[in-house]
Amino acid sequence: MAIHLYKTSTPSTRNRAVDSQVKSNPRNNLIYGQHRCGKGRNARGIITARHRGGGHKRLYRKIDFRRNEKDIYGRIVTIEYDPNRNAYICLIHYGDGEKRYILHPRGAIIGDTIVSGTEVPIKMGNALPLTDMPLGTAIHNIEITLGKGGQLARAAGAVAKLIAKEGKSATLKLPSGEVRLISKNCSATVGQVGNVGVNQKSLGRAGSKCWLGKRPVVRGVVMNPVDHPHGGGEGRAPIGRKKPATPWGYPALGRRSRKRNKYSDNLILRRRSK
C-alpha cells in the first residue's frame, strides 16, 4: 500500500494519510444503489448498534465470492477502493468476456492472471477446493456451505491456514484464532487479503471518521447515572462497581455473547482467542 502524506498546512492534513495507488470509479454494470436506513436501529427504531450514523452515500459493488468461472483465466485490470469494506477489490476480465470484481489478494498487481477450478496451480488469487490444497496453505474467502460463496476471512489482511485433512472435513485455523472443521469440498482462495496496513492508517481528523458513518464514542464515566451505570458522582469519580458494566448493566469484560447450543458448536475444535 503506497501511503501519500500531505504537506503540513493544517493540523488535520498534517496527520492524514491516504493510499495514492487505488482508483475509485467502478463499472456501471457492477454497481447498484442501496437504501441505507436505520443506521444502527432495529425495526422499532431503537439503537441496537451504537456509534453508527451519517456517512457518505455508497454504491454497492457486486463482489464475486463464489468464483464460479471455472477453468477460465482472467486478468487483473484495476485495483479499486470499495466504501463497503476495508479490503480493496480488483476488476477481472475473463477470457470469455465476463467482467467481475473479487477481493484483492495481497501482492497481486495489474496484469496478473488468476483462475478457479479443481486442478489449478496453487498460486496467489486462484480459487480451488480445500481437498486439492496442500497442508499449510494460506487462504481467504472460505466457503462454509458448498456453493454459497466465501464467508470467512474476507476483511483486509485476513488469512486462514489449512492445518489438517481427515475424512470428509478439513481443519482450518481462522484469523480470530478459532480452529474449526469445514467440508473438504468447499472452495477457498489462495493467499491473504490485501490492504494489510489499514489499521495503521491515520484519518487525521474527526470529519474523516464521520464520512465513514462512525459517530463519536463517549465514555460511560462522564455520563449521567440515567444514561450509564458508570455515570454520576462529584467530579472525576470511580465507576462505583466491582466490575465494569455495559450501558444496559451487563458485565462488560469476559462475558460470552455466543448463543448456547448453536448448531456449529460440534464443528469448533477451539474457541477464538480474545
Swiss-Prot record:
Localization per record: Plastid, Chloroplast
Gene Ontology cellular-component terms listed: chloroplast; mitochondrial large ribosomal subunit
Family annotation (SUPFAM superfamilies): Nucleic acid-binding proteins, Translation proteins SH3-like domain
Chief localization: plastid
GO molecular function: rRNA binding; structural constituent of ribosome; transferase activity
Chain ranges passing through the membrane: none
Keywords: Chloroplast, Plastid, Ribonucleoprotein, Ribosomal protein
Entries under SMART domains matching the protein: Ribosomal_L2, Ribosomal_L2_C
Keyword Ribonucleoprotein appears in the UniProt entry: yes
Region (Disordered), start-end ranges: 224-274
Any one Gene Ontology BP term: mitochondrial translation
Superkingdom, taxonomy of origin: Eukaryota
UniProt entry tagged with the keyword Cell membrane: no
Similarity field: Belongs to the universal ribosomal protein uL2 family.
Self-association state and partner proteins as the record states: Part of the 50S ribosomal subunit.
Protein name: Large ribosomal subunit protein uL2cz/uL2cy
